[in-house]
Amino acid sequence: MMDVDRSIRVAVDTGDVTLGSEKSIQSLKLGKGQLVIVAANTPKDIVEDVEYYTNLSDIPSYTYEGSSVELGSVCGKPFTVATLIVNDPGDSTILDDLR
């Protein structure tokens, strides 16, 4: 899990990442993004929306093993992050790591 944490942090720091459920779902509806990451404790209705739109847009999703608090911390944010979309991984190898 540490490698995933580091890859997420590098993507946040050097790439283009959209944080938050509403913005993530909006991006999925438009078919934007390369990878969706969902925290393990994300509410069921949000998970269902993410799964529905990832299936429509063929964007892969990954369930982060930690909570939204832990995912927020990994992103370097002082708030919870239930979902995020990696638009551009930057220097991160996250797309290769999770495939």
From Swiss-Prot:
Keywords: Ribonucleoprotein, Ribosomal protein
Sequence intervals crossing the membrane: none
Pfam families assigned: Ribosomal_L7Ae (PF01248)
InterPro entries recorded: Ribosomal_eL30 (IPR000231), Ribosomal_eL30-like (IPR039109), Ribosomal_eL30-like_sf (IPR029064), Ribosomal_eL30_CS (IPR022991), Ribosomal_eL8/eL30/eS12/Gad45 (IPR004038)
Gene Ontology CC terms: cytosolic large ribosomal subunit
GO biological process assignments: translation
GO molecular function: RNA binding; structural constituent of ribosome
Family statement drawn from the similarity comment of this UniProt entry: Belongs to the eukaryotic ribosomal protein eL30 family.
PANTHER family listed in its UniProt record: RIBOSOMAL PROTEIN L30
Protein name per its UniProtKB record: Large ribosomal subunit protein eL30
Origin species: Methanobrevibacter smithii (strain ATCC 35061 / DSM 861 / OCM 144 / PS)
